[in-house]
Curated annotation (Swiss-Prot):
Highly expressed in heart and throughout the gut, with lower levels detected in lung, gonads, liver, and gall bladder. This is GATA-binding factor 5-B. Residues 76-113, 280-333 are annotated as: Disordered. Residues 284-293 have a biased composition (Basic residues). One of its GO terms (cellular component) is nucleus. GO terms for biological process: cardiac muscle tissue development; cell fate commitment; negative regulation of transcription by RNA polymerase II; positive regulation of transcription by RNA polymerase II. InterPro entries: GATA_N, TF_GATA_4/5/6, Transcription_factor_GATA, Znf_GATA, Znf_NHR/GATA. It comes from Xenopus laevis. Keywords: Activator, DNA-binding, Metal-binding, Nucleus, Repeat, Transcription, Transcription regulation, Zinc, Zinc-finger. A zinc finger (GATA-type) spans 184-208, 238-262. Gene3D superfamilies: Erythroid Transcription Factor GATA-1, subunit A. GO terms for molecular function: DNA-binding transcription factor activity, RNA polymerase II-specific; RNA polymerase II cis-regulatory region sequence-specific DNA binding; zinc ion binding. It comes from the Eukaryota.
Length: 388
């Protein structure tokens, strides 16, 4: 590893050889790997790479301070050395002391003739497997940005192309979209939401185009006059009263126009309306608002509903009793009316002259009396309260 170790007595197996693909170490720098080709067949096809590689190895060995070997020491190893693989044959480099051969061999690829350089460069560029070490040797490679930006052949071809015959230019498209400078051949309109064409290709506005499409004729330019109201029709007058103003024109049996009043009078009475009934002003019906009528109807129904229960139901809470004759009451203070008198009073009640009422007398109830009378009330089902 150091110069003292490299110059040992065993010269048959040197630690490092300038031919072998091993590492060269220096005391003050990281290890440097000297690559050698592991494909002899490819190196034979590319001899200029072999020369460059050999000269490069010799150059590194000559610059190393610890290696001062001669030509005799370069052949010291034999084929049985474990450091050298037996499957590959290596060509030995020239002596290190021959500086002219070393420099010439190292600089030979750089000073190569133009023909040789182009030959190797073209071969490498065309195959595509091994790129050339120099970017300028390929004759087929175009110069980078030789012309100005955006001046390539593709851009020139795009700019040189003629527009397709079916395409519309931008100016024509804008004119087609906005429709500036157009005029309807029918009505002379200059602006319309949509321009249309007639059968001959002339421009029509949207209204004229739709009218022509639906009716098959040109749209009339003169607007139709508004229809006069029935009360102001020109040239019409009632054949009976000779008035010219009416809310509705009618016709008599002969088909002559009559006013609304004369027509209704003739329809209802069968005779012409007398002229004495003619009025200068048209009498209109005074219609009542519908909301007021509905309000009155609702209030009337509510009042009738409120009055009807009072007439049917009796507000007096006094009960009416019906008793049988010759039966005494078990309740003290209860007045019993005979059946005959009750029936007569019932007839009077129907007539509305008299009313049968239960009038209790003022007395005080005692608990003993209530307990004694509770049993007969439960047993006798024909009592006055049960029969009522």
């Amino acid at each position: 590893m150091y110069p003292s170790l490299a110059l040992t007595a065993n010269h048959a197996q040197p630690a490092y050889s300038h031919d072998t693909p091993n590492f060269l170490h220096s005391t003050g720098s990281p290890p440097v790997y000297v690559p050698t080709s592991r494909m002899p067949a490819m190196l034979q096809s590319l001899p200029y790479l072999q020369t460059c590689d050999t000269a490069h190895q010799g150059h590194h060995l000559a610059n190393h301070p610890g290696w001062a070997q001669t030509a005799n020491e370069s052949h010291a190893f034999n084929a049985s050395s474990p450091h050298t693989p037996s499957g590959f044959s290596y060509s030995h480099s020239p002596p290190v002391g021959n500086s002219s051969a070393r420099d010439g061999g190292y600089q030979s690829p750089l000073i190569m003739g133009g023909s040789a350089r182009d030959q190797y460069g073209n071969t490498l560029v065309r195959t595509g497997s091994y790129p050339s070490p120099y970017s300028y040797v390929g004759a087929d490679m175009p110069p980078s940005w030789a012309t100005g930006h955006f001046e390539g052949s593709m851009l020139h071809s795009l700019q040189g192309r003629q527009p397709l015959p079916g395409r519309i230019s931008s100016l024509e498209f804008l004119e087609e979209f906005h429709g500036e400078g157009r005029e309807c051949v029918n009505c002379g309109a200059m602006s319309t939401p949509l321009w249309r064409r007639d059968g001959t290709g002339h421009y029509l506005c949207n209204a004229c185009g739709l009218y022509h499409k639906m009716n098959g004729i040109n749209r009339p330019l003169i607007k139709p006059q508004k229809r006069l109201s029935s009360s102001r029709r020109a040239g019409l007058c009632c054949t009976n009263c000779h008035t010219s103003t009416t809310t509705l024109w009618r016709r008599n049996s002969e088909g002559e126009p009559v006013c609304n009043a004369c027509g209704l009078y003739m329809k209802l009475h069968g005779v012409p309306r007398p002229l004495a009934m003619k009025k200068e002003s048209i009498q209109t019906r005074k219609r009542k608002p519908k909301n007021i009528g509905k309000g009155k109807t609702s209030t009337g129904s509510s009042t009738s509903a409120n009055n009807s229960p009072s007439s049917v139901t009796n507000t007096d809470p006094t009960p009416v009793l019906k008793t049988e004759p010759n039966i005494t009451s078990h309740y003290p203070g209860q007045a019993i009316v005979p059946v005959s008198q009750g029936q007569s009073q019932t007839d009077d009640l129907v007539n509305g002259s008299h009313e049968l009422k239960y009038i209790p007398e003022e007395y005080t109830y005692s608990p003993s009396a209530l307990s004694q009378q509770s049993v007969p009330l439960r047993q006798e089902s024909w009592c006055a309260l049960a029969l009522a």
